[in-house]
């Protein structure tokens, strides 16, 4: 017997069955997925930790 895994949509809290029948998992819908993406793009969400202020990417804000 296969155990069905149910997770809560991180955006609205709706129960979502974790499997191929839920293409937007862990979200319940494309709408919730896009709302979450927008929050990350607007920097409303962030991964905790100190910001990396090094210039290791080779880019600089100085004009030449």
Curated annotation (Swiss-Prot):
UniProt keyword terms in alphabetical order: Metal-binding, Zinc
Q: Which GO terms describe its biological process?
A: regulation of DNA-templated transcription
Instruction: List the cofactors.
Output: Zn(2+)
Biased region (Acidic residues) positions are 54-64
Record region (Disordered): 42-64
Paste the cofactor note: Binds 1 zinc ion.
| Domain of life according to the entry | Bacteria
- Recall the GO molecular function terms of this protein's record: DNA topoisomerase type II (double strand cut, ATP-hydrolyzing) inhibitor activity; zinc ion binding
Keyword rRNA-binding appears in the UniProt entry = no
Q: Which residues bind Zn(2+)?
A: 9, 12, 28, 32
Instruction: Tell me, in a sentence or two, what this protein's role is.
Output: Inhibits all the catalytic activities of DNA gyrase by preventing its interaction with DNA. Acts by binding directly to the C-terminal domain of GyrB, which probably disrupts DNA binding by the gyrase.
Q: PANTHER family attached here? A: DNA GYRASE INHIBITOR YACG (PTHR36150:SF1)
What family does this chain come from, according to its entry?
A: Belongs to the DNA gyrase inhibitor YacG family.
Q: How does it assemble?
A: Interacts with GyrB.
Q: What is this protein called?
A: DNA gyrase inhibitor YacG
Organism equals Vibrio vulnificus (strain CMCP6)
Q: What is the lineage of its organism?
A: Bacteria, Pseudomonadati, Pseudomonadota, Gammaproteobacteria, Vibrionales
